Curated annotation (Swiss-Prot):
Residues noted as binding a ubiquinone in the record, renumbered to the chain: 201
Protein's membrane topology: Multi-pass membrane protein
Cited SUPFAM superfamilies: a domain/subunit of cytochrome bc1 complex (Ubiquinol-cytochrome c reductase), Transmembrane di-heme cytochromes
Keyword Transferase attributed: no
Function, as annotated: Component of the ubiquinol-cytochrome c reductase complex (complex III or cytochrome b-c1 complex) that is part of the mitochondrial respiratory chain. The b-c1 complex mediates electron transfer from ubiquinol to cytochrome c. Contributes to the generation of a proton gradient across the mitochondrial membrane that is then used for ATP synthesis.
Subcellular location: Mitochondrion inner membrane
Binding note for cofactor: Binds 2 heme b groups non-covalently.
Annotated positions binding heme b b562: 83, 182
Cofactor(s) this protein requires: heme b
Name of the protein in its database record: Cytochrome b
């Protein structure tokens, strides 16, 4: 009798994706982040669902409903902080996952890569709207500043912003619709993640050496299931350390002040995972230019496959490209730091230089260095 997992229509899909899937024998821990992102997404949906049971999306009661969750709901505090810090873990895994893709040339699977970029935008949109929901000072002013950026769009800008707001300022209508979108988007993200996997399994996984691994495959289970479980345990350990020891480490204290349209906080800044993009936005004096740079800072990933000039897929055997890659990482850390600083000298100049360097590395230096490396191979 044939095994039911290989014949049953539903079990067959799971079997071909997670059990009998032929995987390269040499993929490293950098390939763990896909499964970790899946775990993060499930965790966020579950904690979010329980938070939504107690949250009210009304300007008069939103802040106090979050307080009520933390004070009065059984284990409400841990659910709330797991959700808030779970978002941070989600983005850490996302950045490492994208970084892995850049380093090892995983962008050479264009469908998987492009769905990944759409996923990144969707998760960023979800996180932004989630940050508005507690209706603290940073929630309100963050929503005001970021939605206001759309007014830079010529001709339709102002009408578009008022349409998104549902009025002439960020108010009750804005909060209600943001809650609705924040609730539905993670399910759209789940569907996109399934498509992401579908395209990945069409080609099979990349591996650190960057050469085809068809001649040397091993079954996903038990080898990579156990490896993923180890990664998951480490993820949960770090998350729970954050939640139980310093839950507000990555948050902004201003968000414990209820939203007040009449009082602007001294420094309006988004959550840490948006700071690099925020720094790029601020480093351009022109409003429309800043918005375009902000969008392009993520969208630039879409043209990376077109700029691949190297004869090798990954950077494993390309020391010059490796140096450039780690310079890019340092540059992104610099941008993240600048995004959290006030707009004054010397931070403005550092931000502008870091922004120029970011685009220069991705668009000019990487392809150029790859050509130089190709020529070095001939020596």
């Amino acid at each position: 009798m044939t095994n039911i997992r290989k014949t049953h229509p539903l079990a067959k899909i799971i079997n071909n994706s997670f059990i009998d899937l032929p995987a390269p024998s040499n993929i490293s821990a950098w390939w763990n982040f896909g499964s970790l992102l899946g775990i993060c997404l499930i965790l966020q949906i579950l904690t979010g669902l329980f938070l939504a049971m107690h949250y009210t999306s009304d300007t008069a009661t939103a802040f106090s409903s979050v307080t009520h969750i933390c004070r009065d709901v059984n284990y409400g505090w841990i659910i709330r902080y797991m959700h808030a810090n779970g978002a941070s873990m989600f983005f850490i895994c996302l950045f490492l996952h994208v970084g892995r893709g850049l380093y090892y040339g995983s962008y050479m699977y264009p469908e998987t890569w492009n769905i990944g970029i759409i996923l990144l935008f969707a998760v960023m949109a979800t996180a932004f709207m989630g940050y508005v929901l507690p209706w603290g000072q940073m929630s309100f002013w963050g929503a005001t500043v970021i939605t206001n950026l759309l007014s830079a769009i010529p001709y339709i800008g102002t009408s578009l912003v008022e349409w998104i707001w549902g009025g002439f300022s960020v108010d009750k209508a804005t909060l209600t619709r943001f809650f609705a979108f924040h609730f539905i988007l993670p399910f759209i993200v789940s569907a996109l993640a399934a498509v992401h996997l579908l395209f990945l399994h069409e080609t099979g996984s990349n591996n650190p050496s960057g050469i085809p691994s068809d001649s040397d495959k091993i079954p996903f289970h038990p080898y990579y299931t156990i490896k993923d479980i180890l990664g998951a345990l480490f993820l949960i350990l770090v998350l729970m350390m954050l939640v139980l020891f310093s839950p507000d480490l990555l948050g902004d204290p201003d968000n414990y002040i209820p939203a007040n349209p009449l009082s602007t906080p001294p420094h309006i800044k988004p959550e840490w995972y948006f700071l690099f993009a925020y720094a790029i936005l601020r480093s351009i004096p022109n409003k429309l230019g800043g918005v375009l740079a902000l969008v392009f800072s993520i969208l630039v990933l879409a043209i990376i496959p077109l700029l691949h000039t190297s004869k090798q897929r990954g950077m494993m055997f390309r020391p010059l490209s490796q140096c450039l890659f780690w310079l890019l990482v340092a540059d992104l850390l610099t941008l993240t730091w600048i995004g959290g600083q006030p707009v004054e000298h010397p931070f403005i100049t550092i931000g502008q230089l870091a922004s120029i360097l970011y685009f220069a590395i991705l668009l000019i230096l990487m392809p150029t260095i790859s050509i130089i490396e190709n020529n070095l191979l001939k020596w």
